[in-house]
């Protein structure tokens, strides 16, 4: 979480914002007003629902979740029964091998029921979050075969990953 020169990790930026410190040095000037005026999501906004979900899962169900393997499901389920918070859960599950970042991904995959199977294939679509004139030029020159590329996933509601993205956004909104 230590900045590397001009760049800082997303985790560092989120933590600074949660602590009331504004990381202007690491953001483009145009982003400053957006971040300062936006509501901030608490770090623990979804922790109770994550703990509930894990406590209601069987070892087999958790073993089927993306990035879970080698008996990790047993470690997580034991810890979920003891933990009263997400921080406690991370402390009980974490190790050099199982980093907090990986564990958080697993917890949220469990919440969204994202299976190992779903994550082994290629992406169903590529979502463009932003682009300039050069990006639009490149996009228009791309062949329209293969994986769909879009800035508006609403066109692809029949794709599982688009529905998962929408569910994740809804859950995140509930946690804020």
Predicted features and spans:
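Active-site cores that bind ATP or allylic diphosphates and position pyrophosphate for catalysis
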Residues: 1-176
């Amino acid at each position: 979480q230590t900045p590397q020169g001009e760049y800082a990790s997303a985790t560092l930026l989120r933590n600074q914002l949660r602590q009331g410190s504004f990381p202007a040095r690491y953001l483009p000037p145009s982003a400053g007003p957006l971040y300062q005026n936006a509501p901030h999501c608490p770090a623990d906004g979804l922790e109770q629902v994550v703990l509930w979900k894990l406590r209601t899962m069987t070892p087999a169900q958790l073993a089927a979740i993306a990035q879970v393997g080698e008996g990790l499901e047993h470690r997580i389920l034991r810890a979920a029964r003891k933990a009263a918070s997400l921080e406690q859960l991370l402390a009980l599950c974490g190790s050099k091998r199982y980093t907090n970042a990986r564990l958080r991904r697993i917890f949220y995959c469990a919440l969204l029921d994202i299976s190992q199977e779903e994550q082994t294939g290629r992406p169903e679509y590529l979502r463009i979050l932003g682009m300039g004139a050069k990006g639009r030029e490149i996009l228009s020159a791309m062949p329209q075969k293969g994986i769909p590329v879009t800035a508006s996933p609403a066109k692809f509601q029949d794709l599982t990953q688009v529905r998962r993205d929408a569910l994740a956004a809804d859950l995140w909104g509930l946690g804020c």
